[in-house]
Amino acid sequence: MMAEREEDDDTEEAWMQLRPTEPLPSQCCGSGCSPCVFDLYHRDLARWEAAQASKDRSLLRGPESQSCPSKLNPETFVAFCIIAMDRLTKDTYRVRFALPGNSQLGLRPGQHLILRGIVDDLEIQRAYTPISPANAEGYFEVLIKCYQMGLMSRYVESWRVGDTAFWRGPFGDFFYKPNQYGELLLLAAGTGLAPMVPILQSITDNENDETFVTLVGCFKTFESIYLKTFLQEQARFWNVRTFFVLSQESSSEQLPWSYQEKTHFGHLGQDLIKELVSCCRRKPFALVCGSAEFTKDIARCLLCAGLTEDSYFLF
């Protein structure tokens, strides 16, 4: 009977049941991660083909999602427990996840993670950048904006403290080194502020880093500006300046006095970018993060302002 069972296990049908399933487009976050979910699929498919050819199922064994807190892994989704959720605006949350003991997440400033969610039996993945300091111990935080028709938004809005969420990473091609640039020009729209936060904090936390920083945050209204207290605190450092561009407000009269002189109205366009570049105290290197349309437009404006393609990075 045992021999018959082993023969049944080696039938074509049995092997086809073990064949990896190709991911749906919704399972790709679209941020250019390496390894991408499709890279992992092709890896697992090659492993399956080798196992089938040799009739050796042990070759199929690979990393699976870990159900308890563990070290972050770019190939394996790891569960982290939600320990706090703060609503920053009507549609945006700051979510804190626990790390085991006093461990650190292990990301370099500006790197991002991939979140996996399941809604209506459909698996989806999206990229988010932690906003907590790179050296934060025992936790990490992410900034998540929810959209009315977004699948991941439905998943995030179902979260409660004590729930777990699955992440993998880190990913990202920008690596900041102290004093690497004379000045950083940080241009962010909405939640594109996220990768700028740990980069900025790593500079101000390091008394030996003398990099100048000019941060420009683009938002619809004053109320929609994220992390106001943090940004105000950062602007007190001798080497940091912050500016804001509000697209749906037209007057500074209703703004707090501390924002009136550093807020522009309308959109971040070519003229303002030329002014920002010319006002930099040292030769700037620009970091840009926002929607695809925003990053494309800003890249064009930076070139018109005299920067070269190797003088900016698009997240």
From Swiss-Prot:
Q: What InterPro entries is this protein classified in?
A: CBR-like, Cbr1-like_FAD-bd_dom, FAD-bd_FR_type, FNR_nucleotide-bd, Oxidoreductase-like_N, OxRdtase_FAD/NAD-bd, Riboflavin_synthase-like_b-brl
Instruction: Name any GO cellular component annotation.
Output: endoplasmic reticulum membrane
Instruction: From the UniProt record, report the name of the gene that encodes this protein.
Output: CYB5RL
Protein name (Swiss-Prot/TrEMBL): NADH-cytochrome b5 reductase-like
Q: What is its EC number?
A: 1.6.2.2
- According to its UniProt entry, this protein's organism is Homo sapiens (Human)
Instruction: Note the Pfam families from the entry.
Output: FAD_binding_6, NAD_binding_1, Oxidored-like
Tell me the function of this protein.
Answer: NADH-cytochrome b5 reductases are involved in desaturation and elongation of fatty acids, cholesterol biosynthesis, drug metabolism, and, in erythrocyte, methemoglobin reduction.
Protein's GO biological process:
bicarbonate transport
Q: Which family does the record claim for this protein?
A: Belongs to the flavoprotein pyridine nucleotide cytochrome reductase family.
